[in-house]
Amino acid sequence: MILATTGSTCATLGEMVTVLSIDGGGIKGIIPATILEFLEGQLQEVDNNKDARLADYFDVIGGTSTGGLLTAMITTPNENNRPFAAAKDIVPFYFEHGPHIFNSSGTIFGPMYDGKYLLQVLQEKLGETRVHQALTEVAISSFDIKTNKPVIFTKSNLAKSPELDAKMYDICYSTAAAPIYFPPHYFVTHTSNGDRYEFNLVDGAVATVGDPALLSLSVATRLAQEDPAFSSIKSLDYKQMLLLSLGTGTNSEFDKTYTAEEAAKWGPLRWLLAIQQMTNAASSYMTDYYLSTVFQARHSQNNYLRVQENALTGTTTEMDDASEANMELLVQVGETLLKKPVSKDSPETYEEALKRFAKLLSDRKKLRANKASY
């Protein structure tokens, strides 16, 4: 499933743009976190380096909602200018803070959760770090309800739009501020002229509908066009793009069918919850379908890997069930997913595909380092 590093591939591997995309899904972020822990462990093993981190291998890391939080955790520098969190630290983060984030602190007429604990823990963990300090290019989405436009936070856009150099904790809260669940987030930055620039942001899934893979790939394409290191890459040259997309599991609500008679009895809240669940699941499916088709049409199908569990049941479908029992189930979902085949047509498991992915990422990193030394 993953491109082998033989033949002519090695000649251009060093110029390949590598992209990691992480879906939104609340507490279900435990599933991609489990996958990331496995991948980072493989990179450490392949390179015989226990300090290897995901940010060392990906040119672009993008995420929305809980995926944006994961993106920040693995790209925000500590005092040694290394990622403040290893992949193995993410699942424990959810276990420690999830029950406090998803508590019953909301009101009947407002969001389900007040978001105060979430913002507090993000401030504590991410400090005053801003976008420009991220250890690799990031793509974190949100949506401004005042301007009615998506807002995409990336390093490469700061020269043109310095007001986007926001604090990472503001960005993380904003991308996670799912309507119904958390309040919108207001904060202020400044333009190049020193003028105040206001943000009124909600969940990034409003902009990317849960799956930020297309957004992340778009940022990577622009990066390839602007960076001399990727001078041989032409627009839409997917042979030189390597995309790993991690899902948070499809929702059983998407698989369930309803009759007009049944839905006619729903109130506004039931409709809102159902529409959000259905839209996210449907969009995730269509994004994967589109990317699979495009990569295949350009004879680059082995450069795209979507890791997704399509059979969530029970409490694991809920984005806000942070009970210890459910979080344990989500870890099991991620671990079991690694053993499942990538597709019905291939016996290769996700674990095997990710091992080869790790080897490819390692080889590409070494080739680029060798090229830079000349």
From Swiss-Prot:
Motif (GXSXG): 63-67
GO cellular component: vacuole
Transmembrane annotation, as ranges: none
Subcellular location: Vacuole
Similarity comment text for this entry: Belongs to the patatin family.
EC number assigned by the record: 3.1.1.-
Residues the record marks as carrying a glycan: N103
Keyword Chaperone: no
Organism of derivation: Solanum tuberosum (Potato)
Motif residue range(s): DGA/G: 203-205
Lipid metabolism among keywords: yes
Additional facts recorded: Patatin have a dual role as a somatic storage protein and as an enzyme involved in host resistance.
Alphabetic keyword roster: Coiled coil, Glycoprotein, Hydrolase, Lipid degradation, Lipid metabolism, Plant defense, Signal, Storage protein, Vacuole
Domain notes: The nitrogen atoms of the two glycine residues in the GGXR motif define the oxyanion hole, and stabilize the oxyanion that forms during the nucleophilic attack by the catalytic serine during substrate cleavage.
Family annotation (InterPro entries): Acyl_Trfase/lysoPLipase (IPR016035), PNPLA_dom (IPR002641)
PROSITE patterns, sorted: PNPLA (PS51635)
Record-given protein name: Patatin-2-Kuras 1
